[in-house]
Every structure is written in C-alpha cells, then in structure tokens.
A protein has these predicted regions:
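Carbohydrate-active catalytic/glycan-binding domains of CAZyme proteins
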Residues: 1-533
C-alpha cells in the first residue's frame, strides 16, 4: 500500500470525472475558456497521473470566441463502453444574471489519445451533462436544469433531468423528466449515474462550488426513481470546518479498482491567506469509499470530511515536484501549453521562422475575449519561479510583449517590454486587479536599445516579485505584490463568481494592427519545494 497526499492534481483541475478501463484509470477535468478543451490524465496506480489527451483541439469541436471569463468548458463527463470512449461537455456562452446559455455536446474516440470525433449536439437545458451506459445497452443523459424563474425558489437550479440518448440517431429521444430535486443543501448540479448491484446511484454536487460545497448520494431501484437520499448525507463536505487543509470538497465521481476497492475523485480548494483565498484554484483529490451493509457509499474511516492522506493499493512513490524547461526546439507548441478560447494559428505564432525561439505576432489586448496572442502554463505550486528571455523591438507604445501572471481578462499582473517616443525601449508593469488598472512603475524603466531581456516572476505563497536581468545572472526586482487576488475567492468578496485558476503566460500585443513579432527564447517553471507539500 502507498500513502497518497491530496490533491493528486494541483493547480486548476476542477470537476474530475474518474473512470477505470481494465487496469487503467483516467480523469477528465474542466478547462473553461482555455484551449484545447478538457484535459484527460492517465494513471496505472492512482498515485501518479500524466496528461495524455486534450480531446477538444479543433475549432469544429470547440469555438469559444467571445465566451465570458469562466465560461467555455464546464464539468466534462468521461465514460467508456464497448471499446469506445465518450466525452460529454458544455460550451457555456453566458453565465451572468438569471440566464445561462449552455449547449451540451458529445464526442467519441476509440483511443483516449486519438483524434476525437466532431461533436454531436445534445441539448442546452442546463450544464454538467453526464452520459450513463445502463447494463441493458441503453444510454441516458442527465444534467442540471437552469430554472431562470426566481419566484420558484430554486436559485436557478431546477433539479436533475433525465433523457435517453440514441447512438443510432445521434440525438436525445423520448420524454424528459426531472428525477431528483436535490436536498436542503440546494444548488444541485454535477450529476453522475451508476448502476451498482440492485440500485441506481445518483451522485450530485450541492451547496455551490465554494466553502459550502458537498457531495450528495441518492439511490433508486428504477432509473426514473424515486430517488432516496442517503442516511449518511452528505457523503463528503468540508463545510463548517475551516481548520481543514482541503476546503470546498465536492463534485465527485466514483470508480472501483480491479481488487474491489472504491474511490471517489472530487475537487477541493486550499486557502492560504487570511481572506481564505485559494490561489491554485480548484484542484483534484481522491478519497477511498467503503460500502455499508445496506449498500450506501461512505468515506473510509467514517464521517464526511476530506482526508489529505489516503491509502491506495500500489507500491508507487508519489511524485509531487513540478519543473519544466522549454527551449522551443520543436515545430509545435509544448503539449502542456494552453491558449485562450481558440487555438493559435500560423498567423499568430511560429516556431520555425527563428529556430529555437517562439515567435508571437502581436494580437489583441489582455482584456480581449476574442483573439489574444498568448500561450500559458498552469500554476501548479503555491511557490514557484517562472522566467523567460525576450527579444522585442517595438516602435510604438501600443506594442507590448512579456510574461504575465494571468487569471482572466480583468485580473492579471503583467511584466512587459514596450516603447516610449522619448526614451525608446522600456520595461513596465500593468496591474489589473479586478478591473482596477494601474501602472505601478508609472513611466517604466529604461532599457538598452538592443539585446535580450530576461523576465522573472517569483512567487512565495501570496507574495510575488517581478524582476529582470540583461544576462540571466543578477535579477533586479521592480515590483512586489500580494497576488492572492488572482483567485475565485477575490471575486466572491465583491459579489461575483469565477471558477478557474492562475496561469503564467507568454504574450504579445499590437493594437496598431501591424502584428509586430516578439521572440521568446525559452520558458522555465519550477515549483519551490518547501511549499509544494
């Protein structure tokens, strides 16, 4: 047996959908406005996980042009039946006010790392859609229903809807019905159905994806219900226990092992500040499940609080260090890199124009929801060093390039090169804290007219230092900040909702429209070990 420390996937890895195929385990997670859509991890031991697939990698599968911050791909459902992998996902177009526009789609593939199909449209009545394969060969879709009538008292969550899916016709068929209205916790979402023994089990998330989050279990002898709430409700929550290291526990999925054990994957948040801000976003954890004599799933060890240490049946040693050094020697972007909303095209970047460099052609501003030129790496550690080397020769103040600690279009900290008509090349900082924009260095720092500039972000928990160097030796600090505002929780403090996580991006802007290029010679990221654990 091996002791595994939670979370098993650090940084932004929310809404885990966990399955087993023979001896292989897979977890699919939400990606929101980041492209490619959905990330799928593989493990042979439940201990160490490797990113193996980013299935929604074509515009024909996923076009998120213009989607709001924290829109896009919500809560994918990964499943497997008769040699085929199925992936259901939402592409959320709007999320504010009473209404949410949430078209749901299905793609398939015979290999987890293969080319997934173009999507089949399913419905748009709500989000968190999940496909269930019953033992009789029929397939069913469940999703929460968005009820935009406030006088109904549902807070927008109208219950879990069930409808049959026809593989032959590639559409939903038959009548729709609400099979579960939820418990008193409310905000019933994230459904997954399982047929285990004599019962259908419905797993849902409740309480909202914050500090009151929870996992609810109900069961029925018939698929259509009625569903009875577990006497051990909720299965999992950290609500009311702010002393726990794992907060926001909820949105779970279940699988068994080949030796008969059961596990649940769920999301969590780890607050590190007095304001209870989770700077790494919502992460993925694992809990062992045991079944009662009368057939209810419960946490091993009793109670319903998430454990930060669990046992798994393996002799593998957990790997928790994160270090990457990209030198841009290939002709494609590194597999781990992401872009915003849509893929970069050959008009946006090149890895061949100058071998050994990533050339980014200036695009729209960091506030754009349409066509930014940015590629980013997820922050996976509370403390880290990230740096790059940049060659950039702007001739207009509207041309900028650099390294950005990015949450979304109105929440980022940007260290960049630009140009001033009186001083030539300059280094500056743009701080966009929840729409409050400022230039802390005012006019910036003069730079030599030619040559490379090394840029570095160093973060220790919530404390960030931006610095630069001309030789990659002695770095000169230019700005320090409390960057805990790059979090879901900072939005909650002002009455708004976000669901993603911080990234470190390389980017280039040219709002003259001339698409002036910037050349990046490398990207380096290393988690600092004293806070990784």
């Amino acid at each position: 047996m091996t002791i595994v420390k939670n979370p098993i996937l650090t940084g932004m890895h929310p809404d885990p959908s966990l399955i087993r195929v023979e001896k292989d385990y897979y977890i699919a997670v939400s990606t929101f406005e980041w492209f490619p859509g959905v990330e799928i991890y593989h493990s042979e031991n439940l201990v160490n996980w490797k990113l193996v697939s980013r299935p929604l990698n074509r515009i024909s599968q996923l076009d998120m042009t213009g989607v709001p911050d924290s829109g896009g791909v919500w809560a994918p459902c990964l499943s497997y039946c008769d040699g085929i992998f199925y992936l259901v996902y939402s592409n959320v177009k709007s999320i504010y006010g009473f209404f949410k526009d949430t078209p749901n789609y299905l793609v398939t593939c015979d290999r987890i790392d293969g080319d997934w199909s173009d999507p089949v449209y399913l419905n748009a009545s709500g989000f968190d859609a999940s496909l269930f394969h019953d033992t009789d060969g029929r397939k069913w879709l469940v999703n929460m229903v968005n009820d935009f009538r406030p006088w109904k008292g549902t807070s927008g969550f109208g219950g879990i809807e069930l409808q049959e899916y026809s593989c032959k016709e590639k559409k939903l068929i038959g009548r729709k019905q609400i099979i579960f209205r939820g418990s008193s916790l409310g905000v019933t979402e994230g459904p997954h159905l399982y047929h285990i023994g004599d019962y259908y089990y419905l797993i849902t998330a409740e309480g909202g994806t914050g500090y009151d989050h929870a996992v609810t279990v109900a069961r029925a002898t018939k698929l259509e219900g009625p569903y009875t709430l577990s006497p051990h409700h909720p299965l999992l929550t950290s609500a009311g226990h702010r002393e726990l290291p794992l907060q926001k526990a909820g949105h779970a999925s279940l699988t068994d092992t080949d030796d008969g054990r059961w596990y649940a994957a769920h999301l969590c948040g780890r607050p590190i500040t007095e304001h209870s801000r989770c700077v790494l976003g919502r992460e993925t954890c694992l809990q062992e499940i045991v079944w009662t004599a009368d057939g209810w799933p419960t946490l091993k060890g009793g109670g319903n609080l998430p454990r930060d240490m669990i046992e798994v049946p393996s002799n593998a040693v957990q790997e928790r260090s994160h270090k990457a050094h990209y030198r841009f020697e290939d002709e494609t972007l590194p597999f781990e890199f992401r872009t915003l909303r849509i893929p970069l095209t050959k008009q946006d970047y090149s890895l061949t124009e100058r071998p050994g460099y990533l050339r980014l052609y200036g695009g729209e501003s960091l506030c754009s929801r349409f066509h930014q030129t940015m590629t980013a790496f997820r922050q996976e550690d509370f403390s880290f060093i990230a740096k790059t080397v940049l060659e950039f020769y702007p001739d207009n103040f509207q041309k900028t390039a650099g390294i950005v600690h990015y949450y979304d279009t109105i929440n980022f900290l940007y260290l960049f090169l630009s140009w001033d008509e009186d001083r030539g090349r300059i280094l500056n900082v743009l701080r966009n804290r929840l729409r409050e924009q400022s230039y802390p260095l005012e006019g910036g720092i003069n730079l030599p007219p030619e040559g490379k500039i090394y840029l570095k972000i160093e973060v220790h928990m919530e404390h960030s230092t931006l610095s630069y160097s001309l030789e990659d030796t002695e770095y000169i600090p230019v700005y320090t900040d409390d960057i805990s505002y790059l979090s879901d929780d900072a939005y909650s403090e002002i009455g708004e909702y976000r669901f993603t996580g911080a990234h470190i991006g390389l980017c280039c802007q040219d709002t003259t429209g001339e698409r002036t290029p910037a050349d990046f010679g490398m990207f380096y990221y290393e988690g600092i070990a004293d806070t990784v654990e």
